[in-house]
Amino acid sequence: MASMTGGQQMGTNQGKGVVAAGDKLALFLKVFGGEVLTAFARTSVTTSRHMVRSISSGKSAQFPVLGRTQAAYLAPGENLDDKRKDIKHTEKVITIDGLLTADVLIYDIEDAMNHYDVRSEYTSQLGESLAMAADGAVLAEIAGLCNVESKYNENIEGLGTATVIETTQNKAALTDQVALGKEIIAALTKARAALTKNYVPAADRVFYCDPDSYSAILAALMPNAANYAALIDPEKGSIRNVMGFEVVEVPHLTAGGAGTAREGTTGQKHVFPANKGEGNVKVAKDNVIGLFMHRSAVGTVKLRDLALERARRANFQADQIIAKYAMGHGGLRPEAAGAVVFKVE
């Protein structure tokens, strides 16, 4: 049977000079679906899990550090002055990084033409971008404590250093999720002991890892493991506690802090090292599995907390929304931080 010819093609744009003339549906109405597909929310994971202090003015904040002393028996006739040893003092200083900003400009004419709201989503995205920058900076500082060269790796001699724990097998040998999960759990067993040997409190210990490592731990703790129900929630796929550590899943584990450009790493502060072995680097993007710490290991100093500002830009006939904060981030206690890394191949 011959094909029908001459029928109307109401959806085809047959205007003169149209480039996409082959699209037979071009003129049909595009009905608003009722939902704007916004980016999934990004959540800060470090804000409530490390030390945060606010200052009203100044460029930095001082954190005094005190050492330890020891007791000694005093025999009759001996002088305390002959036995006394001074308690050493030092300090850690966290400097404000500067004013971190994110903004968007909404033109009146485009806002009038648009048929769905964007302001609330734009505002959320601005706030999230600053929160992610703070997260990245804190996580990079944990890695930084692990990478300090030996002559600076303790606040005061005897207080302890950061702990870097290698897996027993290299990365290539740990492609199986269950095997990797068991390696991480074994490493956290060593991490627990290392922190306790440094007299780090048992409460407020956290292990940050990427989704692959988090899933590996889940796989190792699933129903074939003893007491799995006390450690994980199988329905939600979440981990409650492993070896005294709150396990936190972080997609942006190695992102680092913000820089001077909105894209790329130009002028980036709080850089997460890229490669192990460069200088004194023991923990880097190419070998890290996870970072562990006590909440006192890293600090944030706030000069200006996260705030939103709305301004009228009459010369552009537009509204501007600005998110901003002035904070600084830094390592405080090397003895309360550490990392789990893959064995060197």
UniProtKB/Swiss-Prot annotation:
Region (Intercapsomeric interactions): 11-25, 152-156
GO biological process, one term: viral translational frameshifting
InterPro entries noted in UniProt: Capsid_Gp10A/Gp10B-like_dom, Capsid_Gp10A/Gp10B_dom
Annotated Pfam families: Gp10A-like
Domain of life from the UniProt record: Viruses
GO cellular component assignments: viral capsid
UniProt keywords, alphabetically: Capsid protein, Virion
Subcellular location: Virion
tRNA processing among keywords: no
Keyword Protein biosynthesis in annotation: no
GO molecular function per UniProt: identical protein binding
Main localisation: virion
Family: Belongs to the T7virus major capsid protein family.
Matching HAMAP family: CAPSID_PROTEIN_T7 (MF_04119)
Function, in words: Assembles with the minor capsid protein to form an icosahedral capsid with a T=7 symmetry, about 60 nm in diameter, and consisting of 415 capsid proteins. The major and minor capsid proteins are incorporated into the capsid in about a 90/10 ratio respectively. Once the capsid is formed, encapsidates one single copy of the viral genome.
Record remark on domains: The N-terminus interacts with an internal region of the major capsid protein subunit in an adjacent capsomere (intercapsomeric interactions) to stabilize the capsid.
Known partners and oligomeric status: Homohexamer. Interacts with the connector protein and the minor capsid protein. Interacts with the capsid assembly scaffolding protein; capsid proteins and scaffolding proteins form building blocks that assemble to form the procapsid, each hexamer of the major capsid protein interacting with 2 scaffolding proteins.
Name used for this protein in its record: Major capsid protein
